[in-house]
Structure formats: structure tokens, C-alpha cells
Amino acid sequence: MNTLQKGFTLIELMIVIAIVGILAAVALPAYQDYTARAQVSEAILLAEGQKSAVTEYYLNHGIWPENNPAGVASPASDIKGKYVQSVTVANGVVTAQMKSDGVNKEIKNKKLSLWARREAGSVKWFCGQPVTRDNAGTDAVTADTTGKDKEIDTKHLPSTCRCFQIGSVKWFCGQPVTRDNAGTDAVTADTTGKDKEIDTKHLPSTCRDKSSAE
């Protein structure tokens, strides 16, 4: 009389182990990316906390704050978190730097920047890789070439913090605007023909920019 075989055979065990190995190989990198993004979000949150003070300083003085004491009244080392070493304000550029330990290895000591410029009477903020501003009286920024190794991999940044306008041309689409002269980037809403504006509901989502026309 035949007896039922119980348990796994060697081949079945090897198949199970192989499947577990494949799942681990897929899941581990995904988990590492997730933890890095979560830690970077703290840097963005702390940096964004300085935006209102920097904006207020600019609107009151007409120039960007040169440093932390001028802009946010707190030393860079005092603005920190579990994963963030410091948040520095330099000529209006807010830069957060990750810690060297206790964080995901792919973002150790890495940086990101928030910066703003005046657009049609308002201040518009951007977020992306670390940048610098040569002086407090200008809106222009340049990539921080002193530390390319400090850039955070784009995959660890949220879609709202991947600005690459430096050194490139960015186009906008929206209601009709005018530019006073060919030597400036500034545009204003075309007030001579408000009746010529297309109702927003008839425009695609990619053609509803108002930041440059208010």
C-alpha cells in the first residue's frame, strides 16, 4: 500500500528559495528608494518653512536676505531635523543639507535648494538641485558647481522639486501677455484685450499658467 509523501522535496524547496530571493531582490531597492524619499521630504519641509520669512524680507527691502540672521533669524545649525543637518539661507537661496549618518546611504551629505524670483509683482518659488546666487540684488541663480557630488538623485525628489530651469529656457502657456522689451524675461497680462481671453475650461491643463501674467 502506497503512503502519502509529506513535506517538500528538495526541488520544491529550491524553487521556494529562488522565488523568495527574486522577491527580495525586487523589494529591497524599492524600500531603499522609499526611505530615501521619506527622508528627503523632511529636508523640503524644513526648507519650505523659511520661505515666508525670505519672501517678507525681499518684499520689505527689495533684495534677498544675505544670510540666516537677516532672513530667518535662526543659525543654519539650529534648523535641523532627524535626517537634516542644517538649513542655510544665502542671498535668498534656501539650501538644506542631509546628515552624514543615520540617513539612507544614497543621500548622505546631499543637498537641495529652494529659491525664488520676482514675477509680475509676486514672488515665485522653485525647488531642485543646489544652486547659488552671486548677490542679494539679483534673481539669477547658477548651479552649485562646487559640489556636484552633493546633488540628490532625481528619483529621490518629489515631482515638485525637480526644477531644471538653470541654464535652459522654460516655456509657459496661458492667457495673452505682452513683453515691454526684447531684453527682459518679464511679461505682463495683456490688459488691452481682456475680452480676448479664452475661458480656462477650454484650455488644456498644460496651458493655464498664471504666474507670468498676473
Curated annotation (Swiss-Prot):
<dbReference type="InterPro" id="IPR012902">
    <property type="entry name" value="N_methyl_site"/>
</dbReference>
<dbReference type="Pfam" id="PF07963">
    <property type="entry name" value="N_methyl"/>
</dbReference>
<dbReference type="InterPro" id="IPR001082">
    <property type="entry name" value="Pilin"/>
</dbReference>
<dbReference type="InterPro" id="IPR045584">
    <property type="entry name" value="Pilin-like"/>
</dbReference>
<comment type="similarity">
    <text>Belongs to the N-Me-Phe pilin family.</text>
</comment>
<dbReference type="Pfam" id="PF00114">
    <property type="entry name" value="Pilin"/>
</dbReference>
<feature type="modified residue" description="N-methylphenylalanine">
    <location>
        <position position="8"/>
    </location>
</feature>
<dbReference type="GO" id="GO:0016020">
    <property type="term" value="C:membrane"/>
</dbReference>
<keyword id="KW-0472">Membrane</keyword>
<feature type="compositionally biased region" description="Basic and acidic residues">
    <location>
        <begin position="192"/>
        <end position="214"/>
    </location>
</feature>
<protein>
    <recommendedName>
        <fullName>Type IV major pilin protein PilE1</fullName>
    </recommendedName>
</protein>
<feature type="region of interest" description="Disordered">
    <location>
        <begin position="182"/>
        <end position="214"/>
    </location>
</feature>
<comment type="function">
    <text>Major component of the type IV pilus (T4P) that plays a role in cellular adherence, microcolony formation, resistance to neutrophil mediated killing, twitching motility as well as transformation. Mediates the attachment and the formation of bacterial microcolonies on host epithelial cells. Mechanistically, pili retractation induces host NF-kappa-B activation in infected cells, which is temporally associated with the formation of gonococcal microcolonies.</text>
</comment>
<dbReference type="GO" id="GO:0009289">
    <property type="term" value="C:pilus"/>
</dbReference>
<feature type="disulfide bond">
    <location>
        <begin position="127"/>
        <end position="161"/>
    </location>
</feature>
<comment type="subunit">
    <text>The pili are polar flexible filaments of about 5.4 nanometers diameter and 2.5 micrometers average length; they consist of only a single polypeptide chain arranged in a helical configuration of five subunits per turn in the assembled pilus.</text>
</comment>
<keyword id="KW-1015">Disulfide bond</keyword>
<dbReference type="InterPro" id="IPR050470">
    <property type="entry name" value="T4P/T2SS_Core"/>
</dbReference>
<keyword id="KW-1133">Transmembrane helix</keyword>
<keyword id="KW-0130">Cell adhesion</keyword>
<keyword id="KW-0812">Transmembrane</keyword>
<feature type="propeptide" description="Leader sequence">
    <location>
        <begin position="1"/>
        <end position="7"/>
    </location>
</feature>
<keyword id="KW-0281">Fimbrium</keyword>
<feature type="transmembrane region" description="Helical">
    <location>
        <begin position="8"/>
        <end position="28"/>
    </location>
</feature>
<keyword id="KW-0488">Methylation</keyword>
<dbReference type="GO" id="GO:0007155">
    <property type="term" value="P:cell adhesion"/>
</dbReference>
